[in-house]
């Protein structure tokens, strides 16, 4: 499930693995595809073929997780990160996600076209106007309204 998430953080006692080959099956539900896209095909093959579990520090080192926190700091860190995302213009965050996801499925030139269209789409929003005005006026954004 975690490999389906945009951002993955864990506590320092987390353990990750793909044990399926030890059960005589392949990882399902996108496990082979998501892992390869996150950590690269070589590391994904090693993890899947050996069915070896890895600890949080190794998961961070190979790019499976974005950050590792002590257990008692995990939830506050997650809330802080969520608040940091939530304070930004929802339309812009959504367009960034779309640009990244769609761009990964295309060549660089096509991906840039996707990004340009989404970038331009932001200029039709109230949130862009408020964000740019606040920047130019050297003040905080009053509110992003998701429109």
Q: What residues fall within each predicted segment?
A:
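Crotonase-fold acyl-CoA enzyme core
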Residues: 1-91, 125, 130-133
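Acidic catalytic patch
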Residues: 93-101, 133
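Terminal low-complexity tails and localization/encapsulation signals of metabolic enzymes
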Residues: 133-147
């Amino acid at each position: 499930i975690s490999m389906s998430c945009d951002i993955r953080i864990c506590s320092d006692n987390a353990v990750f693995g793909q044990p399926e080959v030890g059960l005589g099956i392949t990882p399902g539900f996108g496990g082979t595809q998501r892992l390869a896209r996150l950590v690269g095909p070589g590391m994904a093959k090693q993890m899947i073929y050996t069915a070896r579990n890895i600890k949080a520090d190794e998961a961070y080192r190979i790019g499976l997780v974005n950050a590792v926190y002590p257990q008692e700091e995990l939830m506050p860190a997650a809330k802080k990160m969520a608040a940091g995302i939530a304070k930004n213009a929802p339309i812009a965050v959504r367009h960034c996600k779309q640009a990244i996801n769609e761009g990964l499925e295309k060549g660089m030139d096509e991906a840039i076209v996707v990004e340009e269209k989404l970038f331009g789409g932001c200029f039709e929003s109230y949130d862009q106007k408020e964000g740019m005005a606040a920047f130019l006026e050297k003040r905080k954004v009053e509110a992003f309204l998701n429109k």
